Design a protein with these regions (language model features):
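Bacterial signal peptide processing site
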Residues: 19-22
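Short solvent-exposed coil/turn linkers within tandem alpha-helical repeat scaffolds
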Residues: 24-26, 58-66, 94-103
Length: 112
């Protein structure tokens, strides 16, 4: 009995978290998406972070969040072991932000 209740609660929790993520993907609240991407990144959910950040890069261009977003996108790919895409993203980062906060780290991760 207790086992069935526990399984039901766990399934409901998993389904609700997937539902929240899907709502987030459809949302036009880019500030909320940015904060969610940072949270996913901090929790090690790099695939979800990369999906959100990939969408936000063009939208955040020219803002104070653009630099950090591009670096987090590169690190998300890197942490998923997608080294080729990570290197391309890091190269883009240090070309766009040659004196940026993360330029040295981006060059390191790009192998430059």
């Amino acid at each position: 009995m207790k086992k069935n209740v526990l399984i039901t609660l766990l399934a409901a929790l998993l389904l609700s978290s997937c539902g929240e993520y899907n709502k987030l993907l459809k949302s036009t609240d880019y500030e909320y998406k940015y904060e969610a991407a940072k949270n996913y990144f901090a929790k090690g959910q790099y695939s979800r972070a990369a999906t959100l950040l990939n969408e936000l890069i063009a939208i955040l261009k020219g803002t104070d969040k653009a630099e950090e977003s591009l670096y987090m996108l590169g690190m998300s790919y890197y942490n998923q072991k997608d080294y080729q895409t990570a290197a391309q993203t890091f190269t883009q980062y240090y070309n766009v932000y040659p004196r940026g906060t993360f330029t040295e780290l981006a060059r390191f991760h790009a192998g430059k």
